[in-house]
């Protein structure tokens, strides 16, 4: 729908089925205490991310809650290192968003410690493989 000079909404906005789905999701988040589960797991996730600092191509790691960013040292031109590192991580079995030379990691709120361990292990493999490929 249009409101004067601004576009507002999407094709699914305000449709009863979409509203019902949104309310159902909110009920599940409340019933299963999803946000508190994520809050309790976030220190473990952040600790896992920080454990990757020892890899030589990692420039900086930062995070908050269940979200983290890993800056990969720039190589030749901006964005190239991040994209190439992302491909190595994807080949190692982990998928996420890479923007420029930053790997953005945001696990599902419903994950468990074993999933965090798997994510960190695959990130370590992918980033290490990227580092080795630079040396060849």
Residue ranges and their predicted role:
Residues 4-136:
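Conserved N-terminal phosphate-binding loop of PLP-dependent enzymes in the Aspartate aminotransferase
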